[in-house]
């Protein structure tokens, strides 16, 4: 399976969640702007935060339901596609063994159960959010449910207008920044830990895909008589997996090695997968020289602003910079939605400076820029500026 193909699988789902995030943030920001437009002289026209919440949260719940419906279909399609790729791969070995080829993963109960389980797990947080109590924004170390957060923010806006605060936009700026920087998160009552919906979706789906690959390959490999595995290899590999990538192992040896790893294959953002093989028959994908070149590139040191790091570490820095740029653009869009020209200008300058730094860093580190990972998706309620 092609690594870039695998990496792109969650894109549609992540984009849908990014769109939902921007819709919610900008819906609240538009309400903040409209309240500020009323002014102290007409403060008697203001409703309560709970009254505003009726219309706004109803619209948000409708958008949540729409996005969840689209994502549910996308999860179904995505894992069916992955399963189909696995079946086609396995059929190469079935035919070589003079065995009947699989027509579909549904022809095997075990394979069907793997796919169904992967779909159910992927739905969690990407396609099964049923109401606004399940999502919210981070404030300090807590994730506050959306309704509670909305009422708190709008109450603050109403109070500022009623008291005639001199600079309404400046007074509300910290709230807007907090929302934009947090992004929509799944409310976790137990641990208090949370991740943005879009970020966690990408990681969870990719881990689900790799787990499904592993399960299906192990099952079909057992059927066609595989007695070993070959580990995939890629550039910019983490140090803890560099010694195993691209190599072949017997099933027994691989089980022992994988269990000894602090980060087992395919988990915690690992991009590797194990392909079933017949030892002594299946030729290695990479020669020793090719594998040495790949590993050398991963460990090769670069220097940026006096700091030395491996090329792999540089790739992790690249991801962090992309996230920072995207969040700065989210902040810019939120400020535009509230009508805060100064706040929007500050956020725009910040994103421009981060983008320039990102370009310089990629050039010096020899990394390919990924502009698609730095974009902001403006929600449908606000025209892009």
Where are these regions (language model features)?
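Domain-core detector
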Residues: 1-265, 279-385
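Residues that flank catalytic or metal-binding motifs in active/ligand-binding sites
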Residues: 268
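Catalytic core of tubulin tyrosine ligase-like
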Residues: 272
């Amino acid at each position: 399976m092609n690594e870039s193909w695998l990496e792109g699988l969650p894109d549609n789902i992540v984009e849908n969640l990014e769109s939902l995030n921007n819709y919610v943030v900008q819906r609240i920001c538009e309400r903040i702007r409209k309240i500020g437009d009323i002014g102290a002289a007409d403060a008697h026209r203001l409703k309560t935060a709970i009254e505003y919440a009726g219309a706004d949260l109803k619209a948000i719940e409708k958008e949540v339901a729409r996005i969840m419906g689209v994502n549910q279909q996308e999860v179904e399609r995505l894992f069916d596609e992955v399963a189909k790729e696995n079946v086609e791969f396995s059929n190469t070995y079935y035919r070589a063994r003079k065995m009947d080829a699989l027509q579909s993963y549904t022809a095997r109960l075990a394979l069907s159960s793997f796919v169904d389980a992967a779909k159910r797990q992927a739905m969690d947080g990407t396609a099964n959010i049923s109401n606004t109590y399940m999502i919210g924004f981070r404030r300090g170390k807590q994730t506050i449910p959306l309704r509670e957060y909305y009422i708190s923010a709008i109450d603050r806006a109403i109070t500022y207008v009623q008291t005639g605060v001199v600079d309404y936009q400046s007074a509300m700026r910290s709230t807007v920044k907090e929302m934009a920087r947090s992004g929509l998160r799944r409310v976790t009552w137990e641990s208090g830990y949370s991740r943005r919906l879009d970020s966690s979706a990408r990681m969870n789906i990719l881990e689900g895909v790799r787990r499904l690959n592993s399960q299906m390959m192990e099952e079909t490999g057992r059927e066609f008589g595989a007695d070993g595995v070959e580990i995939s290899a890629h550039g910019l590999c983490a140090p803890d997996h560099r010694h195993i990538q691209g190599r072949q192992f017997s099933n027994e040896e691989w089980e022992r090695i994988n269990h000894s790893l602090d980060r087992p294959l395919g988990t915690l953002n690992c991009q590797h997968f194990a392909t079933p093989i017949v030892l002594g028959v299946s030729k290695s994908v990479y020669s020793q020289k090719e594998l040495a070149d790949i590993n050398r590139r991963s460990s090769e040191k670069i220097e940026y602003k006096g700091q030395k790091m491996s090329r792999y570490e540089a790739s992790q820095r690249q991801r962090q910079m992309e996230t920072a740029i995207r969040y700065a653009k989210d902040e810019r869009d939120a400020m535009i939605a509230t009508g805060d020209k100064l706040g929007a200008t500050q956020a725009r300058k910040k994103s421009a400076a981060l983008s320039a730094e990102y370009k310089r860093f990629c050039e010096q580190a020899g990394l390919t820029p990924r502009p698609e990972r730095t974009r902001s998706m403006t929600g449908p309620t606000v025209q892009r500026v």
